[in-house]
Each structure stands twice: as C-alpha cells, then as structure tokens.
Amino acid sequence: MNWEIVIGLETHTQLSTDSKIFSGSSTRFGAAPNTQANAVDLALPGSLPVMNRGAAERAILFGLAVGGKVAPRSVFARKNYFYPDLPKGYQISQYELPVVEGGTLSFFVGEEEKTVNLTRAHLEEDAGKSLHDEFSLASGAPASGIDLNRAGTPLLEIVTEPEMRSAAEAVAYARALHSLVVWLGICDGNMQEGSFRCDANVSVRPVGQKEFGTRTEIKNVNSFRFLERAILFEARRQIELIEDGGTVVQETRLYDADRDETRSMRSKEDAHDYRYFPDPDLPPLVIGQDWVDAVRAGMPELPAAQRARFEADYGLPAYDAAQLTVSRAMADYFEAVARALPAGQAKLAANWIMGEVAATLNREEKDIDAAPVSAAALAALINRIIDGTISNKIARDVFAAMWAGENGGDADAIIAARGLKQISDSGAIGAMIDEVLAANPAIVEEYRAGKQKAFNSLVGQIMKAAKGKANPQQVNELLKEKLG
C-alpha cells in the first residue's frame, strides 16, 4: 500500500521585545536563573498583567506580511494545565479570537514553488524552564529547579493548515517562515536560544483517502535538520505500526536527536481538556484601523515583493530571485553587487553569490553579514571577468585569496601579485595553438575525423601551456579557425 504523509506545523516565534508580554521584566537571554522574573511572572497574589503594546504591534506586522486578517478585537484566554514551570497553573494565550486569522506563505522546494495556508497566529506567554544542572542543595549536591526567567516572554504561535506532504516541504516552509520573521525584525530567529521552535503534527493515510489519520505532535524541535529527521522517523513509525496491525495513538512525542527517534511524552490533549475561558484580568485587545495603517506604513519591502522586483528589474529567474531573498542581508548584498556592474550583468552576480559565496559561507557556517568579501569587493572581481582581465576559472582562485584576506582582499592587487592577468593577445594565443597542433598531429586527425573530444583535448593542452591564463573564448575561436 502507498502512503501519504500529512503535516501541519505550529511555530512558536519569540517576539523581539525588550520586556515580557504582560510584565516589565527583561527578556534578555542568558541571565542567572530567576533574576528576570517579577511578581506577575511569579503569579504572586494581587499581581495583574498589562499588555505589551510592542508585542501586539509585531503581531500586526506579521499579519500584514502574510496577507492575513488582523482582528479588530481579539481576546486573551486562560489555557489551564499543570506543569512545574507554569507558576499560575494556566498559560495566557488566545483561543477563539486570535489576533491574526488566515494568510499564506509561499516558498520553494527545490525549484518548485509551493504555498501553504495559515490557520491563525495568536499571542501567548512562554512558560518557565526546568533546569537540571544550574541548582544545588545546601550540601552542594546537584538538584533540579525551575528558572522563571523565560516565563511571560512574548510568543506569536503561527499555525498552518495540514497541507504539507513531505518532510522536505515542511522544512522549506519552516525556513521560509524563519526568514520572514527575521526579515520583519519581529524575532531574532536564534534557534539555539529557543527563539524559533516548531511543533510538527504528523499523520499518515493511504494515498487517495480523504479522511486524515490519527495525528501525533512532535514538540519543540529547534533545528531544521532535526525537524526533517523527526518527521521522517515518525511517518515511518506510524506506517510500520499500521501495517503490523497496530493503531496510532493521539499523543505528544519528543524527538531524541542522539537516537534519531521520537518517543512518547504524554497523551495528546484536545482543546476542551484545557478548559479555555477569557482571562478576567485582561481586556480584549482592540486594534483600530489607524494602528494597522501606521504599522503598514512602516513595513519594509517584503520578500515576495523583492523577489518580483528582482525578476522584473534584473531579469533573474524566479528560483534565483527566491534564493537571493532568503534574508534582507543577502538581498542587500546582491543588489549592491548588481548595481556596481554594467547593465545586464545581474545574472552573473547572482551566479557568484549563489555559487562561490554561498558555498563558502555554508562551509564556514557563517551568515552573509560575516562574509570577509564585501559586496563592493565582489563586484570589483566580477568586473575583471567582464572586462576580460581574468577568466571565470582564475576568478575562483582570486576569490579564495580575497576571502583569506590576501593583499587586503583587493582583487586587482591579488591579480597583479600572482601574475594572473589573462592573455588576450591573439598573436600570443595563436603561437601557442600552433605549437600544440604541431606537437599533436594524431589528435588533430581525430578531430578532423569527427571526434569532439579531440578538440577538448587540444584546448586543455593550450590552456596548460598558457598556465590557465589564456582567454578561453579566444582560444576556442582561434583553434577552430586553424583547424578549418
């Protein structure tokens, strides 16, 4: 039997506010345990929550960016459950009336564009954290404890429809969402610090079946690689279980990266188990049209708009435009390079950034902001390819030297110091061709007998004689002339 995977994602995006969603405590990461929790965060009697306007503003910005409906009136609700790191015994969230409803997010899986519908985005507070190596007893023995620094940190939970059908598609969506929230400046996107965490709802069903299978939820995956592996494992587990005559149980599971498996955490609750009801201490969040308009006026150019502009203004293919707008920094880098080149050369800039630059960044695990070769420096190098000073092949060697900081990272200085200037004198190239032809009569005859590989062999020998510095286009043209 052929199976189809059905995936929906819930993403907890930590909003980049200086203070918590309902209190004035700092949201700074890495402070000593329980040094950033006040009476509201600790749920002390008599303390009352006050809504953080900045958190609401970031939610509005997100809603506008994805084309969702920003609710003129949304309500905070108490989500009741017990957990050691939840001091109030409930979490303040939104249920029936979220701040954003609907919206879409488009992204590429390989070179295929996909669009996923969003169900909602709602504001809520984060819980605290259980720690097992930060506390000790009076005797000095290690002890577990609760750190409430994170309690009350503002989150925007973004929920998709169950429309994704592969782990690769889910990861591509998560990457696109991550890029968007960082692009908008509403989240720092630091997955190691927990600023962007995904819950994956996974089920399987026979291909062609309309009804969904029983889903499990994989909680708090904070790595794109782990998200893909967790979904793949869970889908395989469910398929094998069903094919062996078992039944999938609705439950919450955790992904164990060391064992590359998911394991049961607890039975999965339904909404009614949380006994949601409106929080009596918080008034409804009322968002007037003037507030929405003010946020819209301050919006940056969105990735989708910039992709369209790159296609229209620079003639880039849709895939290239998508790759170059994965972050504002990458888009700005490309545009700075393209503007420093002659008209019509933007595709060459795109090829270099998606090729040599991206590969080197990935290898060194750096972001474009940390690239030692600036946009201006890369443009200077590409201009030397365009004007024929060096070949594309030699340019890659020059780029590596620039990245390493040789000669101050200056392309012209490296070319001069290494003697890499391309030979474009037709007389000098012609003389080298004559020598190679005279030394290889058998290969010449093979070419004239119709063997194309023989031509490539001759080109290789000519380039070797020129130490790679002969203009490849001129070599090809002159060689064809001489061979008749």
Swiss-Prot record:
Keywords: ATP-binding, Ligase, Nucleotide-binding, Protein biosynthesis. Its EC number is 6.3.5.-. GO terms for molecular function: asparaginyl-tRNA synthase (glutamine-hydrolyzing) activity; ATP binding; glutaminyl-tRNA synthase (glutamine-hydrolyzing) activity. It is an enzyme of class 6 (ligase). This is Aspartyl/glutamyl-tRNA(Asn/Gln) amidotransferase subunit B. It catalyses: L-glutamyl-tRNA(Gln) + L-glutamine + ATP + H2O = L-glutaminyl-tRNA(Gln) + L-glutamate + ADP + phosphate + H(+); L-aspartyl-tRNA(Asn) + L-glutamine + ATP + H2O = L-asparaginyl-tRNA(Asn) + L-glutamate + ADP + phosphate + 2 H(+). GO terms for biological process: glutaminyl-tRNAGln biosynthesis via transamidation; translation. InterPro entries: Asn/Gln-tRNA_amidoTrfase_suB/E, Asn/Gln-tRNA_Trfase_suB/E_cat, Asn/Gln_amidotransferase, Asn/Gln_tRNA_amidoTrase-B-like, GatB, GatB_C_1, GatB_Yqey_C_2, Gln-tRNA_amidoTrfase_suB_CS. The gene is gatB. Allows the formation of correctly charged Asn-tRNA(Asn) or Gln-tRNA(Gln) through the transamidation of misacylated Asp-tRNA(Asn) or Glu-tRNA(Gln) in organisms which lack either or both of asparaginyl-tRNA or glutaminyl-tRNA synthetases. The reaction takes place in the presence of glutamine and ATP through an activated phospho-Asp-tRNA(Asn) or phospho-Glu-tRNA(Gln).
